[in-house]
Amino acid sequence: NLYSNPEFIPSKDDIKSVDANAILSYLSESHKYYLKERLPHIESHLKRIIEACPARFGNTINRFFNEYKDEVENHFKYEEEVVFPYIKSLCNNALTPNFSIREFESNHSNIEDKLNDLMNILIKYLPANIFPKERIEISLDIMEVTSDLSCHTLVEERVLVPFVEMMEG
């Protein structure tokens, strides 16, 4: 429902009926998809564009994207290595005393916003005559990934977090 209606807010009954393993599997697979498919695809467009533009613009774009990629990798790694195992242990009635989902909430960054920043950098710094078709393609790719990451975040924030809060009691 969140993909078709981002305004959807699940009821308590919806949250109670959550299949945590299915959600964790979906989130984990989407992490792999972003890291192995979507980000490399955007990066391949960027490399072609960067090669054709003046070094000062190319270096700015390249540095920003590499920092973004590192942030996304760290974000997903934290979820995969800390948050998801914690949730699995809760589902198996094994409470982990040094962590709570509130810690995740307070540290949960909005990684899709930086893609909007990348789009703004491309618009601001990239000379208009460099690969106009490529610019359109990368813009569409960035918008698509931004939208998808936004839905991904909604699943975490509106479904997974409330579910875990219920389990924590």
Predicted regions and their residues:
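Small-residue-biased structural context
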Residues: 1-169
